[in-house]
Regions:
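N-terminal cap/lid segment of alpha/beta-hydrolase-fold proteins
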Residues: 19-54
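Short substrate-entry loop that stabilizes the transition state in hydrolases
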Residues: 54-57, 65-104, 225-227
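C-terminal catalytic histidine-bearing segment of alpha/beta-hydrolase fold enzymes
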Residues: 241-288
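The conserved beta1-alpha1 loop
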Residues: 63-65, 219
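Alpha/beta-hydrolase active-site loop
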Residues: 114-143
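Alpha/beta-hydrolase fold nucleophile elbow
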Residues: 144-156
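The feature captures the conserved acid-bearing segment of alpha/beta-hydrolase catalytic domains
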Residues: 175, 181-241
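Glycine-rich nucleophile elbow surrounding the catalytic serine of serine-hydrolase chemistry
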Residues: 154-164
Length: 288
């Protein structure tokens, strides 16, 4: 696939990090939808890196979630600023993309999985996964990136997409990190009772059959989107079919609104960072 890139803005050298560079690229993507329809449009991809590196750096593709309240326009490429900084400080080039339908990327809601009682998670994650794969291809083409040393990570819907990417065995990816990944949650109207968790459990089992890279799953004990027990069942289904992974039960998150522990990625970084450090070290990414 050709990758014509349009540089929207070459950001700045931060005073606190003299060599920190941020830029926003547009990436033309093409996704196959239901009935073999094709949708083509540009994605906004934020690229965050340390320009002082003396050799190509590993990369991390970071995926965002999906709003329970339908506020798709609120997403930003730098929405996880503190978490992006952590990964850049670990030596990664971070690519944080906005999928079709979200934030500045705009467009239709191509990931819609249907009604709550019959959610088609396989379709929805396949559409998101096609976009992840094309962002990965972009990453591996950039001159300052080591194309064989990549990680895919995400939060909420993006966490599930990280496991979907692991199941694709995409070139250059050697690990996946799932922060509170899942789908169909509504912490206000159905706290701890997401739509059709059984269907998502079966899908995670399917992912486990083909995924070959190590994975890390992190969930807070008071995640109001999924509850405490359902994520354990999802992880068990994945590993029972051959998926490699480690599950970390993070502590409860307080004063975080209706979602509770679903905000662990942004609210208790000190709790999860030690586990992510260990995982990255184990798969060959030592601290610079």
């Amino acid at each position: 696939m050709a990758l014509p890139l349009i540089l929207l803005c070459f950001a700045f050298l931060s005073p606190a990090h003299a060599a920190r560079v941020e830029e926003i690229l547009t990436l033309p993507v093409s996704v196959t939808l239901r009935h073999n329809e094709t949708h083509n449009q540009n994605l906004h991809v934020g690229v965050f890196r340390d320009d002082s590196a003396q050799k190509p750096q590993p990369f991390l593709v970071l995926g965002h979630g999906r709003p329970a309240n339908g506020n798709f326009g609120a997403f930003r490429v730098d929405g996880f600023r503190k978490q992006i900084d952590y990964f850049v400080n670990r030596g990664f080039v971070v690519l944080a993309h906005l999928r079709i339908g979200y934030g500045a990327s705009g467009g239709p809601d191509v990931e819609n999985a249907g009604p709550c009682n019959n959610r088609d998670f396989a379709y929805s994650y396949n559409v998101g996964g096609q976009q992840t794969a094309q962002v990965l291809t972009l990453a591996r083409s950039l001159p300052y990136i080591d194309p064989e040393r990549g990680v895919v990570a995400g939060q909420s819907y993006g966490g599930a997409l990280a496991i979907e990417a692991a199941a694709r065995n995409l070139p250059g990816i050697i690990g996946a990190i799932n922060f509170a990944g899942g789908g169909g949650g509504d912490p206000v109207n159905r706290p701890g009772q997401p739509c059709r968790p059984d269907k998502l459990e079966a899908l995670y089992a399917d992912y486990g059959r083909t995924a070959s890279v190590p994975t890390l799953w992190l969930y807070s004990e008071n995640d109001a989107f999924w509850g405490k027990d359902i994520p354990h069942a999802w992880f068990a289904a994945f590993t029972a079919q051959g998926g490699k992974g480690r599950f970390v039960q993070l502590p409860a998150v307080h004063n975080a609104g209706a979602g509770g522990g679903h905000a662990a990625f942004t609210r208790i970084q000190s709790e999860w960072q030690v586990h992510v450090d260990r995982f990255l070290n184990d798969i060959g990414f030592t601290t610079p």
